A protein has these predicted regions:
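Short, well-structured N-terminal submotif of metal-dependent ribonuclease cores
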Residues: 1-20, 32-47, 99, 112-114
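Acidic, PIN/NYN-like endoribonuclease modules and their adjacent C-terminal/linker elements
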Residues: 10, 83-114
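Short strand-turn motif at the edge of the Rossmann-like AdoMet-binding core
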Residues: 23
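Short glycine/serine- and small hydrophobic-enriched flexible loop segments
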Residues: 30-33, 87
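Internal alpha/beta domain cores that form substrate/cofactor-binding pockets in large enzymes
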Residues: 46-47, 54, 58, 73-74, ...
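Active-site neighborhoods of divalent-metal-dependent phosphate/nucleic-acid chemistry enzymes
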Residues: 54-97
Length: 114
């Protein structure tokens, strides 16, 4: 995705702030372990992402918000936790390959990567 590549380069150069849910990193690890993502690619991403993005783990407040989002938008809980983490962190955009998150309409823009 061209726009995602440009955003990544900007973050790597210190322009703006990226935020990533710790759960997204765990998901990358899982994908690497099960072979859905090449192990080397997963390892590279797991090193690179925290180097340029602030890693945020959900707390109870985020969990409560996620439960409501999951219920209201019919999202799987992990997806709702990622969304709630972005909202609690004050993110303006959420970049994702998860089409389910496209159902969210609100304070942040969901960018679906295809």
């Amino acid at each position: 995705h061209e726009e995602a590549g440009a955003l990544w380069r900007a973050l790597a150069e210190g322009e703006g702030e990226g935020v990533v849910s710790g759960l997204s990193l765990v998901e990358l690890l899982r994908l690497g372990l099960k072979g859905a993502l090449a192990k080397e690619d997963a390892e590279l991403l797991l090193q690179a992402i925290p180097a340029v993005c602030r890693v945020v783990w959900p707390d109870w407040t985020t969990g409560e918000r996620a439960a409501r989002l999951s219920h209201g938008l019919y999202l799987p809980l992990v997806d709702a936790l990622v969304l709630a983490t972005a909202l609690e962190a004050g993110a303006r955009e959420l970049w994702t390959t998860d089409a389910d998150l496209g159902r969210y309409e609100g304070k942040l823009r969901v960018v679906l990567l295809r």
